[in-house]
């Protein structure tokens, strides 16, 4: 199944994972999970090392063409295509966002969170997040 990619990366494009689902995610018969605006996510959530970035880079363009600002919500990943929609979870907080940049460039980490994503997740700076990749939308969502 192809990765679901959004048509545009929005600087404040995060969608609370609970939006429209009452905080619940369901598991479909094919093993995928649903949640956050009708997206269907790969399941189960997978752990990944993460850091955050931003200070000193604000005003610069990301690899995906956005201008990075303190409130920009998104993630950097080395190989996932720009615009790939992800659900990211950390210690009871979660959000749905997109890949907007390339990185991280520190060994052992899979994601760099923007400051806006870090704040939305109450992320402490370095740690393990859990993620799932959007693989489509439920019928009738959009």
Predicted regions and their residues:
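Secreted/periplasmic proteins
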Residues: 1-142
